[in-house]
Amino acid sequence: MLLLWLSVFAASALAAPDRGAGGRRRGAAGGWPGAPNVVLVVSDSFDGRLTFYPGSQAVKLPFINLMKAHGTSFLNAYTNSPICCPSRAAMWSGLFTHLTESWNNFKGLDPNYTTWMDIMEKHGYRTQKFGKLDYTSGHHSISNRVEAWTRDVAFLLRQEGRPMINLIPKKTKVRVMEGDWKNTDRAVNWLRKEASNSTQPFVLYLGLNLPHPYPSPSSGENFGSSTFHTSLYWLKKVSYDAIKIPKWSPLSEMHPVDYYSSYTKNCTGKFTKKEIKNIRAFYYAMCAETDAMLGEIILALRQLDLLQNTIVIYTSDHGELAMEHRQFYKMSMYEASAHIPLLMMGPGIKANQQVSNVVSLVDIYPTMLDIAGAPLPQNLSGYSLLPLSSEMFWNEHKLKNLHPPWILSEFHGCNVNASTYMLRTNQWKYIAYSDGTSVLPQLFDLFSDPDELTNIATKFPEVTYSLDQKLRSIINYPKVSASVHQYNKEQFIKWKQSVGQNYSNVIANLRWHQDWLKEPRKYESAINQWLKTPH
């Protein structure tokens, strides 16, 4: 039934728009004549490589495939910080993480920060938000904060439970992530009751929590674990035979930051191939459920005759490692964590186009303003994606000059014991750490080594040096790292003073309690030594 509907859909709702009504750019700042509506759907933890071959073979994603066929897909889109709040802060501000000082899941934008949605509202758009936002300061657990603040301390503590899977008993259950479905329903109802009757163009944002792993409510050995949770209905969308078992480096050969991450994520123990494959299968099933919610929005737009004048954008805050590089979650510059989906469909957007240029989430802000015809602030880190996706600009030579040939991503939060900076160009991925000297950098040739298994930084010193110089021209990363060190220490001292002398007992009840309770005096001593050490 879905295939039949998609064929009808392709012939009608997404027919090429009249070039007189759309598809033209207005001035240098841009803007579509006729002020199209915009719908932005942002999921959590979606590996962008699933939206194109060969990753797309592992799971059925019909509505993402629909957007690919009738719109533009960006093959090399990246998060600007592979963790929820800092990534979303970059998307809503159009600025790199270090410019807004969105250092961790607790430290994001000021609640009164002017976002692209605020500007679109001032330019005549009716605006609405549903679901997960998570770009302002003050959220997330004490565990998450303390773990981020103390990452400079010289100890190793498991901060996560071992990743798990859970198949719900009801085989036919479709709405597994009920909270996301409720927000999707709210968005659809708003389209029907408000947007369809509005004389203004509208911009609708829907934030989904899927396919982020679920927190485990269990206690005991797996307390605090993350659970990949789904039903048989969604597992049937996964091609089990197409699931790739990732290669792992021996623990003794891992990069020191990778080892720290793997240890704190409780992934240094033994995992069978079946365990790994099941975790990945359940994750892909959660991606299929995410795709269905995106589909509900597209279906509603079609049914309300809004689709022909609505630009639909789908992306995610970051990816999910799903046991690649012996890790789950994100917090890494490896492809599974940093590579995100980014698809655009609608009036003036070229159909069935794949753009290989590197782009990132800071590009959402100028893109939104460009659609609205609003002037672009000069201080933005991002660039409008309209020239890359427009029917009028499809020229290989011009495309190279429409966006810088690099993107920047940085990470300063928990589960990683050094500030991390990634410069991605067409062929290379360069990853620098901390002050640039105390931790060895990494260099990967993504053309010959897409799985990022061989660090060639010392083998190609000229390339490494050149990329490091380029990175330093964009961001003074040793200085930023020092600022984060100081921030972490100041925040921990404030928190420690707020809980009094029993702070050790408080820590003993956080996620890392199992390790802390074995040798509390040892870890208290390590913290005291860290607090005394000047940076």
Swiss-Prot record:
EC number(s) from the headed UniProt entry: 3.1.6.1, 3.1.6.18
Q: Which InterPro entries does the UniProt record give?
A: Alkaline_phosphatase_core_sf (IPR017850), ARSK (IPR047892), GAG-degrading_sulfatase (IPR051849), Sulfatase_N (IPR000917)
Give the gene symbol. Answer: ARSK
Q: Which residues carry this modification: 3-oxoalanine (Cys)?
A: C84
What protein family does this chain belong to?
Belongs to the sulfatase family.
Q: What does this protein do?
A: Catalyzes the hydrolysis of pseudosubstrates such as p-nitrocatechol sulfate and p-nitrophenyl sulfate. Catalyzes the hydrolysis of the 2-sulfate groups of the 2-O-sulfo-D-glucuronate residues of chondroitin sulfate, heparin and heparitin sulfate. Acts selectively on 2-sulfoglucuronate and lacks activity against 2-sulfoiduronate.
Organism of this sequence? Canis lupus familiaris (Dog)
List the protein's name.
Answer: Arylsulfatase K
Required co-factor(s) are:
Ca(2+)
